[in-house]
Amino acid sequence: MQLSDIFLRLGEETFQQLMHSVSMGRLRTYQLFDRMKARLHLHKLNSETLRKASPRLWARLGEHDDEFATDLAQAILVSHLDMIKAVLDHLGVPHQDGFFAKDTDVSNYLKDGWQSEVWEKFRAAFPPAALLFYINHLAWEVAKAEDVFAPAA
């Protein structure tokens, strides 16, 4: 499974919510603002232009451009570092402000059922779309998941 598959399987509505949650301040803090502006082909990057560009960005994800998906994921994840830190702390995963140390194997911290457990614990505290994306991103990145986690309705 590729990163673009996570976006596509979560659906366009979830993608729209994720785009609305991107923090311009965090993009600037982590020096991603100019890179994102260029990758998204936007002359001006702000919440409104990002929202308006979402249908076009969704179409680009459908082309399975994994570099593009990686850049989008990075923008989304840095916008939700408080959530990431809370989830990693809950799972007991060692991290530095939400980031893993280089060459660290954290897969042994992800026990059976961790996705449902994290969803139930944090879904009321954080935006559901961002939490669902992070759960799937973590599973893909660390556990090499081949399927997308979707909580029971």
What are these regions (language model features)?
Residues 1, 149-153:
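Short intrinsically disordered terminal tails
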Residues 24-143:
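Acidic, low-complexity, intrinsically disordered interaction modules
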Residues 1-34:
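Short terminal alpha-helical segments
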